[in-house]
A protein has these predicted regions:
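Non-catalytic alpha-helical scaffolds and adjoining flexible linkers that form interface surfaces
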Residues: 1-277, 285-288, 294, 298-332
């Protein structure tokens, strides 16, 4: 980028990192440009022109210009005030942190357009800030749909290996979902046997069937969350730093994904170009991020026609979270 170019884009701040005495590097997931890292000069000064608009989870409209190594943020305006609500609520804060970290991990290349992921992240943060749904369910719905966007949608109806229609009882993380009896006996070491209610919950979260999801028992919620976390860890090849801190259904209980996986080749997932569902559209109606939140939070398929463009990204845990005691209760 030899020539300086000024451009505008909307973005979610995923992460911030200190730079020198007054600056920050912000990692952004932009609507048109994917993941971008940029410098916000003077943002840590008391009288900074950016105020608090470049904190993690901020949804902002930005003006930037291209730099030699990093772009430079010159203007920032808040689009959605997610930060105050999320920073004041520990369960929602930790879920937002996991969402931001996942989004950054799924965008390996900078300036690679990731419009669907951007829309999904905005929808998830909006749902968290509206405080109408259980935050851990919103997180699991986001993770399932984000994995589907990456081509890693778990097999929750048929066999992950041969496609034999279910119901099946064995769930094998390395194979990518449920296995029939024949495939389970063909070297699927370490397959779990989750309760049918847990699989039903995962399918409901992936499809946006919130009445079904919200009627699930706590035991099914915890088991489904463990399976989702283990699937994500398998595909990313290491766990998220933020996920063990997520407050599950009001109980501060870090998730411990299975540590032993069978030495089986990863499944090759082929996306069907004719099906939005194959790329993790999220809802049976073809919307991306459908039912993560209602109203403005639902992303319509028409939004996907927007041409992709650059983005900016960096750290995700700089906003002060509420103090937490070892028992998981907020400190008084």
């Amino acid at each position: 980028m030899g020539q300086v170019t000024v451009y505008r884009d909307t973005a979610v701040v995923l992460r911030v990192t200190k730079l020198g005495e007054a600056d920050r590097i912000v990692t952004l997931l932009t609507r048109r440009g994917g993941r971008v890292r940029a410098v916000a000069k003077g943002v840590r000064r008391t009288k900074s022109k950016f105020g608090g608009r470049l904190e993690p989870f901020s949804h902002v409209d930005l003006q930037l210009y291209t730099g030699r190594n990093l772009d430079i943020v010159t203007q920032a305006e808040t689009l959605d005030p997610f930060v105050p609500v999320l920073a004041a609520d520990y369960p929602r804060y930790t879920c937002a942190t996991a969402i931001a970290e996942t989004a950054e991990r799924l965008t390996a290349e900078e300036h690679e357009p990731s419009l669907r992921l951007y829309l999904l992240v905005v929808s998830a943060l909006r749902a968290l800030s509206e405080t109408r749904r259980e935050p851990s369910m919103i997180l699991d719905a986001f993770l399932l749909r984000a994995m589907a966007l990456a081509g890693w949608a778990p097999a929750l109806n048929g066999c992950a290996r041969c496609g034999e229609p279910g119901p099946h009882t064995a769930f094998h993380i390395p194979s990518g979902g449920l296995l029939c009896a024949v495939c389970r006996g063909a070297g699927a070491v370490g397959a779990a046997r989750p309760a049918p209610a847990s699989i039903e919950l995962m399918a409901a979260l992936a499809d946006g069937a919130w009445p079904v999801a919200e009627s699930a028992e706590p035991a099914a919620c915890r088991e489904a969350s463990g399976l989702v976390a283990a699937l994500l860890q398998w595909h990313l090849e290491r766990g998220l730093r933020s996920l063990p801190m997520v407050d599950r259904l009001g109980e501060f209980a870090p998730i411990a994904p299975p540590s032993v996986f069978a030495p089986i080749a990863r499944p090759s997932v082929q996306a069907d170009p004719e099906s939005d569902r194959s790329v993790g559209s999220g809802g049976s109606d073809g919307t991306v991020g459908a039912a993560l939140s209602d109203g403005a939070g639902v992303i319509q398929a028409a939004d996907l026609a927007v041409p992709p463009v650059p983005i900016v990204i960096d750290s995700y845990a700089t906003v002060d979270a509420p103090d937490r005691t070892p028992s998981g209760r907020a400190a008084s």
